[in-house]
Amino acid sequence: MTDQQAPVFQIQRVYLKEASLEQPNSPAILLEQESPTVDIQLGVNAAPVAEGVFEVTVTATVQTKIKDKTVFLVEATQAGIFEIRNLPQEQMNQIMGIACPQIVYPYLRGNVADLVQRGGFPPVHLSEINFQAMFEQQQQQQAGAGADAPQLVTQ
């Protein structure tokens, strides 16, 4: 195998791409005694940015409500730039759908907890995610659809 043919997988950068915190019903909602409900949605996306270079993002949406009123809404997207070359497409899809999100996700967890805490609330700690199971579920859903590239995965 020549150097040009050797498989390449390198992290170029991990960064917080987007983050927002909304408290649309503050300060009145803060006086409520009832415990809020918490809804957490996660998504993974991969997109090429150059030849052999991909951006993989993990997005979290955390919404807490008391009855039908929002206490806070956090949306955050953590991204990583990865160089991935000289691999079969199937392996590239697995790397972008499993390995890359596993690298990016701990940063997202920390940023979400920090953002919520800076908003004046107890931190929300996102649980560990089995990205392999998410990827396999996505592949089963896309079977027969002919999609080769990783697309949005939600849980």
Swiss-Prot record:
Cleaved signal peptide residues: none
SUPFAM superfamilies, sorted: SecB-like (SSF54611)
Sorted UniProt keywords: Chaperone, Cytoplasm, Protein transport, Translocation, Transport
Record GO terms (molecular function): unfolded protein binding
Entry's Gene Ontology cellular component terms: cytoplasm
TM ranges: none
Subcellular location: Cytoplasm
UniProt-listed GO biological process terms: protein folding; protein tetramerization; protein transport
Function: One of the proteins required for the normal export of preproteins out of the cell cytoplasm. It is a molecular chaperone that binds to a subset of precursor proteins, maintaining them in a translocation-competent state. It also specifically binds to its receptor SecA.
NCBIfam families (alphabetical): PRK05751.1-5, secB
Subunit structure: Homotetramer, a dimer of dimers. One homotetramer interacts with 1 SecA dimer.
Family: Belongs to the SecB family.
Protein name from the UniProt record: Protein-export protein SecB
Gene source species: Albidiferax ferrireducens (strain ATCC BAA-621 / DSM 15236 / T118)
Top-level taxonomy: Bacteria, Pseudomonadati, Pseudomonadota, Betaproteobacteria, Burkholderiales
Gene: secB
